[in-house]
């Protein structure tokens, strides 16, 4: 797979590469994220990890769990590196996420963390877990795609592998 680039006007901080492998990703939502000053500084330094992150809905509010933002040593009032963080979404989006989680057995997973117009945003996707045979099929598709790209590259350069 080609490396994902940041979209125009966005600065990519982190992305969850495992989410696409472990889940079938569905609808995506862009959410603001409530942060402390030290968390924003560490995000600007690129010190964040989205692996194993997920969202829960509690009393009409969405919280992001499992995101690791490194602690800042020089911060007077630091933050909890893996604490729950509140997400800012419209009410209809929250209701849709809540229904999908409760009725359809889906999971809300964080896929990308980025700055947009100076504000920290997180992209969450409604996801359904893949079975192990689905994961094996994904690996086969990726290998086939990688081989096709190699043939095209070597064929164009004249190595005689075409």
Swiss-Prot record:
SUPFAM superfamilies: Small protein B (SmpB). Signal peptide: none annotated. It is found in: Cytoplasm. Coiled coil: none annotated. GO terms for biological process: trans-translation. GO terms for cellular component: cytosol. InterPro entries: SmpB (IPR023620), SsrA-bd_prot (IPR000037). It comes from the Bacteria. Pfam families: SmpB (PF01668). The keyword RNA-binding applies. Keywords: Cytoplasm, RNA-binding. One of its GO terms (molecular function) is RNA binding. The keyword Metal-binding does not apply. HAMAP family: SmpB. Required for rescue of stalled ribosomes mediated by trans-translation. Binds to transfer-messenger RNA (tmRNA), required for stable association of tmRNA with ribosomes. tmRNA and SmpB together mimic tRNA shape, replacing the anticodon stem-loop with SmpB. tmRNA is encoded by the ssrA gene; the 2 termini fold to resemble tRNA(Ala) and it encodes a 'tag peptide', a short internal open reading frame. During trans-translation Ala-aminoacylated tmRNA acts like a tRNA, entering the A-site of stalled ribosomes, displacing the stalled mRNA. NCBIfam families: PRK05422.1, smpB. Belongs to the SmpB family. PANTHER family: SSRA-BINDING PROTEIN, TMRNA-BINDING COMPONENT OF TRANS-TRANSLATION TAGGING COMPLEX. This is SsrA-binding protein. It comes from Sorangium cellulosum (strain So ce56) (Polyangium cellulosum (strain So ce56)).
């Amino acid at each position: 797979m080609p490396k994902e680039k940041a979209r125009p006007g966005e600065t990519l901080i982190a992305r969850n590469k495992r989410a696409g492998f472990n889940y079938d990703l569905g609808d995506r939502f862009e959410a603001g994220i409530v942060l402390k000053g030290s968390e924003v500084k560490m995000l600007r330094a690129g010190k964040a990890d989205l692996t194993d992150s997920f969202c829960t809905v509690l009393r009409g509010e969405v919280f992001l769990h499992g995101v690791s933002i490194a602690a800042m040593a020089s911060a007077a009032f630091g933050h909890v590196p893996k604490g729950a963080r509140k997400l800012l979404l419209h009410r209809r989006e929250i209701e849709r996420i809540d229904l999908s989680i409760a009725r359809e057995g889906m999971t809300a997973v964080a896929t990308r963390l980025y700055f947009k117009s100076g504000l920290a945003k997180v992209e969450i996707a409604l996801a359904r877990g893949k079975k192990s045979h689905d994961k094996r099929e994904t690996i086969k598709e990726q290998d086939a795609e990688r081989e096709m790209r190699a043939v095209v590259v070597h064929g164009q350069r004249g190595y005689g592998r075409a």
